[in-house]
């Protein structure tokens, strides 16, 4: 913008200078006569303001409007002209000079018009792009697939947002009319801080022309490639399928807008995006950082599962809980994930957990329900095995639906089992929730039947009981009885290795007491406890936290015989 203004000012100054030069050109031709023959006297005395030259018996002078040849008074002075006949205009040579200068002016004016048109076109493209990526209420397509393969989620973030700057090659700016709409393709730029707009050519080169050897995952609505960016960083490039519909551009732009607003250590960041026509098809891609260990489900099923100690599993659960807590309570706007599962929890080489795949996310209103919808969802979106009962039956999603899904993830961390898998007799499929709920009611069965065999019994029984209890609370049928993600984080913080000295603050006898007494004391640790915690300290939800969950007002309750079912 600054360069365009400077160019316009320079052109204006040149035109003013030319006008001044043109104003100084001789515009009178005088034919003068003299009585003397000494040309040197005439030139020095009478033609100082004009350009005079002898022509046979007369003189031809080219004079400006404010200076004419000197004429002798009464015609008696032989040292000056006796008479002159002046007329407006120029000689043939001066006319040629005037025409050449006029041509220069026309050329400069033509260039100025071209620059103005280019500036106007760039402004139209800028307005088009600004309207396209302006703040909108995020919406989700009803026909979008629930998820993509777990290996498609290999996304990583090793640095902060301020370090996520990438060198992008420039491309030719232009606007194209296609499908009766103005689609602008401009020079790659940054939006929302460190979110970059990549060119399709650059991402094509990064993935070796989207080679099948670069594919790291498939899904119903996308394919994910591993790519090498120009700065040497490895990225996960999610290439979206081209759905049919008039709202495709809106859905994509709102998804980019939503992802660009999220900045938290436990949420996978977006590096950039690409949206442009390539041939007859619109290409839409999202670029994330690469996660070296893949998804939680991949680790539990693969060789890395042998290395997942109990302490690592607690840390993973706490990190994922903090990511969801940020989405529910600190993001602007607050976000409902709607597809919480182990394949959407990614791990880096240090076992740090991050939440990903917000393709089905919804913004939340002040009451915790998804905004823009006052009626149940017409079609279920998500993954079987993680659906909350109220969502599967009535189609009503809320923060507590995410809490239920997170409870299933906790069961996966405890047992190592998949949410839905074939039983040993190979008859049908068995739900992890249905299998685990009866065992969660008995502290003895929790220790003997729930733990993953890969743990080889290497875990603290008290921590296992707390984790199992938390999973059971998240899986309660009544959404209002489930803990919030803030409360989940507080409970997990009591057993994380970094707060081992605070484990005794949680009353272990509370876990398996009778339902009536549990309801009475639930206020003490859940609603009231978190409330007092908010009054005592201010919590920064934008960064990882290691606060403790203290229960000074809750007295331990002795285990009663009726507690076991």
From Swiss-Prot:
Mostly expressed in leaf primordia, root and shoot apical meristems, lateral root primordia, and stele of older roots and hypocotyls. In leaves and cotyledons, highest levels observed in trichomes, vasculatures, and hydathode endothem. It catalyses: L-seryl-[protein] + ATP = O-phospho-L-seryl-[protein] + ADP + H(+); L-threonyl-[protein] + ATP = O-phospho-L-threonyl-[protein] + ADP + H(+). InterPro entries: Kinase-like_dom_sf, Prot_kinase_dom, Protein_kinase_ATP_BS, Ser/Thr_kinase_AS. It is found in: Cell membrane; Prevacuolar compartment membrane; Endosome. SUPFAM superfamilies: Protein kinase-like (PK-like). Its EC number is 2.7.11.1. The chain crosses the membrane at residues 104-124. Residues 24-103 are extracellular. GO terms for biological process: xylem development. Phosphorylated. The modification Phosphothreonine is found at residues 378, 383. Its main location: membrane. The active site is at residue 339. Interacts with ARAC5. This is Receptor-like serine/threonine-protein kinase NCRK. It comes from Arabidopsis thaliana.
């Amino acid at each position: 913008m600054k360069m365009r203004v400077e160019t316009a000012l320079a052109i204006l100054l040149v035109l003013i200078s030319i006008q001044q030069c043109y104003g100084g050109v001789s515009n009178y031709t005088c034919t003068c006569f003299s009585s003397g023959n000494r040309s040197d006297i005439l030139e020095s005395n009478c033609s100082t303001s004009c350009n005079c030259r002898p022509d046979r018996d007369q003189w031809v002078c080219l004079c400006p409007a404010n200076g004419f040849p000197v004429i002798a008074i009464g015609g008696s002075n032989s040292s000056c002209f006796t008479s002159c006949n002046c007329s407006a205009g120029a000689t043939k040579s001066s006319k040629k000079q005037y025409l050449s200068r006029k041509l220069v002016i026309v050329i400069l004016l033509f260039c100025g018009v071209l620059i103005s048109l280019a500036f106007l076109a760039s402004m139209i493209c800028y307005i088009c792009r600004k309207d396209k990526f302006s703040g909108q209420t995020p919406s989700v397509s009803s026909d979008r697939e629930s998820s993509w393969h777990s290996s498609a989620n290999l996304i990583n973030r090793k640095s902060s947002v301020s370090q996520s700057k990438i060198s992008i090659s420039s491309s030719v700016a232009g606007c194209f009319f296609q499908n009766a709409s103005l689609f602008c393709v401009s020079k790659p730029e940054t939006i929302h801080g460190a979110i970059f707009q990549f060119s399709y050519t650059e991402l094509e080169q990064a993935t070796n022309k989207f080679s099948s050897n670069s594919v790291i995952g498939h899904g119903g609505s996308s394919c994910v490639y591993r790519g090498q960016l120009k700065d040497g960083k490895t990225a996960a490039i999610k290439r979206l399928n081209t759905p049919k519909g008039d709202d495709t551009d809106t859905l994509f732009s709102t998804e980019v807008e939503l992802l660009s607003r999220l900045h938290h250590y436990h949420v996978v960041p977006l590096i950039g995006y690409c949206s442009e026509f390539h041939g007859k098809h619109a290409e839409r891609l999202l670029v994330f950082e690469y996660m070296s260990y893949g998804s939680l489900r991949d680790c539990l099923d693969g060789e890395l599962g042998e290395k997942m100690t109990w302490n690592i599993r607690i840390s993973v659960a706490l990190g994922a809980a903090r990511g969801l807590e940020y989405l529910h309570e600190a993001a602007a706007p607050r976000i409902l994930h709607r597809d919480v599962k182990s394949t959407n929890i990614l791990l880096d080489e240090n076992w740090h957990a991050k939440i990903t795949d917000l393709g089905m996310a919804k913004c939340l209103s002040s009451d915790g329900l998804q905004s823009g919808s006052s009626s149940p969802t017409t079609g279920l979106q998500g993954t079987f095995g993680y659906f909350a009962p109220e969502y599967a039956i009535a189609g009503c999603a809320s923060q507590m639906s995410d809490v239920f899904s997170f409870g299933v993830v906790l069961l996966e961390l405890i047992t190592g089992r998949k949410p839905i898998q074939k039983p040993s007799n190979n008859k049908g499929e068995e739900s992890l929730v249905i299998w685990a709920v009866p065992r969660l009611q008995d502290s003895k069965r929790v220790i003997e039947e729930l733990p993953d065999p890969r743990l080889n019994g290497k875990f603290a029984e008290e921590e296992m009981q707390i984790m199992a209890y938390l999973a059971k609370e998240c899986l309660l049928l009544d959404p209002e009885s489930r803990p919030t993600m803030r409360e989940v984080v507080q409970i997990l913080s009591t057993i994380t290795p970094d707060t081992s000295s605070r484990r005794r603050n949680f009353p272990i006898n509370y876990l398996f007491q009778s339902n009536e007494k549990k309801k009475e004391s639930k206020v003490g640790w859940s609603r009231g406890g978190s409330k007092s915690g908010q009054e005592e300290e201010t919590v920064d939800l934008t960064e990882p936290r290691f606060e403790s969950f203290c229960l000074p007002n809750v007295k331990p309750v002795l285990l009663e015989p009726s507690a076991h079912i």
